[in-house]
């Protein structure tokens, strides 16, 4: 037992294993702050169009408006639209809420690091990013097995010297393999910063945001 404990301590020392503590000194909070988390209380609403390249021809889009203070979400596609409350009981939530959470993570994941509590993280310095090979700090986020629509998922974030995300790898269920994508075209929208484009290893833009409005 003593040897096992020592081994675990060494592993945690090497990889900076940390419980979730979103205080200003933790790396997850530093990432959130780099995108303007300290000013997020100035935001009343965020509207945007999610675009994903399904194949060489077809693009799927859906429009969202998140009324942050009112805790309501407006959803629209080419053939439907409606508004729902985030305060609804979990078993009454519309299916599109899964899409809202998915799209919001692609757009606002830095802020989720401050909002979410059900994860653990570890850090590793001087790691090349999987696509560009840029030297970075690797921050791995692993969610618990109980919360959310896809519990147990993991995200490897590759950060620059300013704690901005260069690339990430999403690993479903904390599996060993994932698909690396970029975080590009960071723009200022009101008090916060958002990455508006994600490209794959081939350099092809496959997820992007348009019609962004932050009020």
Roles of regions detected by a PLM:
Residues 135-215:
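Gly/Pro-enriched, hydrophobic low-complexity segments
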Residues 13-16:
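C-terminal motif of bacterial Sec signal peptides marking the signal peptidase cleavage site
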Residues 24-94, 125-126:
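N-terminal mature ectodomain segment of secretory-pathway/periplasmic proteins
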Residues 22, 46-47, 52, 58, ...:
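N- and C-terminal low-complexity/disordered segments
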Residues 23-28, 34, 38, 117-126, ...:
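Intrinsically disordered terminal and processing segments
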Residues 6-9:
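Sec-dependent N-terminal signal peptides
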Residues 20-24, 84-153, 174:
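Flexible, processing/modification-adjacent segments and terminal tails
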Residues 1-4:
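Positively charged n-region of N-terminal signal peptides that target proteins for export
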């Amino acid at each position: 037992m003593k040897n096992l404990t020592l081994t675990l301590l060494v592993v945690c020392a090497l990889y900076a294993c940390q419980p979730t503590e979103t205080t200003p000194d933790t790396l997850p909070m530093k990432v959130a702050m780099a995108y303007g988390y300290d000013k997020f209380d100035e935001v009343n609403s965020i509207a945007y169009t999610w675009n994903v390249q399904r194949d060489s021809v077809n693009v799927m889009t859906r429009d969202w408006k998140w009324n942050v203070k009112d805790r309501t979400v407006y959803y629209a596609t080419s053939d439907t639209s409606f508004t729902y409350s985030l305060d609804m009981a979990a078993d009454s939530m519309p299916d599109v809420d899964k899409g809202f959470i998915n799209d919001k993570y692609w757009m606002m994941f830095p802020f989720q690091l401050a909002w979410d509590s059900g994860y653990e993280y570890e850090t590793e310095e001087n790691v090349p990013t999987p696509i560009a090979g840029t030297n970075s700090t690797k921050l791995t986020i692993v969610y618990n097995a109980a919360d959310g629509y896809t519990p147990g998922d993991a995200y490897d974030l590759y950060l620059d010297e300013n704690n901005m995300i260069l690339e990430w790898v999403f690993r479903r269920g904390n599996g060993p393999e994932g698909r690396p994508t970029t975080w590009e075209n960071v723009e200022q929208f009101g008090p916060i910063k958002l990455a508006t484009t994600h490209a794959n290893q081939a350099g092809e833009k496959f997820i992007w945001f348009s019609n962004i409005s932050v009020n």
